[in-house]
Design a protein with these regions (language model features):
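Intrinsic structural disorder
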Residues: 1, 42-43, 222-224, 228-231, ...
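N-terminal segments that mediate ammonia production and transfer
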Residues: 1-193, 200
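Alpha-helix boundary/interfacial micro-motifs
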Residues: 26-27, 55, 127, 216, ...
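PRPP/pyrophosphate-binding module of the type I phosphoribosyltransferase fold
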Residues: 177-254
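Extended, composition-driven regions rather than compact fold-specific motifs
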Residues: 253-265
Length: 265
């Protein structure tokens, strides 16, 4: 796991996240140092503090679950990383849509997916500009003003489709309670998806068991009667149990594991 520290004339503080130290002590990101691989921070009673190497550094292999779930999204490195993960999905998503922005609505779930969603939308805007330039080059701009207006109106339709009523994470709920819980977590916004016409693209920043998706979210979204639903996840696949004591010990429960099995059938 990561470890960060800050030192001044009065304190030595260590925390797993840079943003927590920044908030508590109101310091700049560059004032907070990350403990290097194989290193230890030694604080002596004399007040002398130093970072020393105690083990040979090995290849850096960050825990994806740490960065997806446990890390504060307001840390500058985590924020930009999550946004870039969303941006990487822009091209494959537009490919699935056939570059049709007019009949597509974009949204996200849960609230923590907003950062990745912004990255996705930024990436789609970049593609949109190229599509507009290409379309304009193929028409008589001076004599087709309405067509020009239509082309320039192309933009991703961003809407807040899912609303979370209660702050809860179903993946850390006991198996016996999870099924009852997932049906009461989200509600939807009506009147923004055109029935049987619009494709609905939903960005998720993490899929663990997929319980909430399968038993609640997809069923709720289906009430809006979209032509189809495309679910995209910005997070790396979670294939193995996490080591920090969360109840997720069975590999067969993971959505990524189940999907891999289905692909092999």
């Amino acid at each position: 796991r990561p470890s960060h520290y800050y030192i001044d004339d009065e304190v030595v503080v260590v925390a797993s996240e840079r943003a927590a130290i920044q908030t508590a002590f109101n310091v700049y990101p560059e004032d907070v140092q990350e403990l290097g691989p194989g290193n230890a921070l030694l604080v002596r009673k004399s007040g002398h503090v130093e970072e020393v190497n105690i083990l040979p550094p090995t290849e850096r292999m960050s825990c994806s679950f740490e960065r997806i779930y446990f890390s504060r999204g307001n840390d500058q490195a985590i924020y930009h990383e999550r946004k870039d993960l969303g941006r990487l999905l822009a091209t494959p998503v537009m490919g699935l849509l056939g570059n049709d922005l007019v009949n597509t609505v974009f949204s996200y779930v849960p609230n923590t997916a907003a950062t990745s969603f912004y990255g996705l939308i930024d990436g789609i805007h970049e593609i949109r500009r190229d599509l507009q330039a290409e379309a304009l080059s193929k028409i008589d701009v001076k004599n087709e003003p309405e067509r020009v207006k239509e082309i320039l109106s192309w933009r991703p339709r961003r809407e807040k489709i899912l609303v979370k009523d209660v702050k809860m994470r179903t993946f850390i709920t006991n198996d016996s309670d999870r099924d009852d819980l997932v049906g009461h977590v989200y509600d939807i916004t009506y009147g923004v998806v055109k029935s049987w016409n619009d494709t609905l693209v939903i960005m998720d920043d993490s899929v663990v068991r997929g319980t909430t998706l399968k038993r609640s979210i997809l069923r709720i979204l289906d009430r809006l009667e979209p032509k189809r639903i495309i679910l995209v996840s910005s997070a790396p696949q979670i294939r193995y149990p996490d080591c920090y004591g969360i109840d997720m010990s069975k590999m067969g429960d993971f959505a990524a594991f189940a999907a891999a099995v289905e692909l092999l059938k």
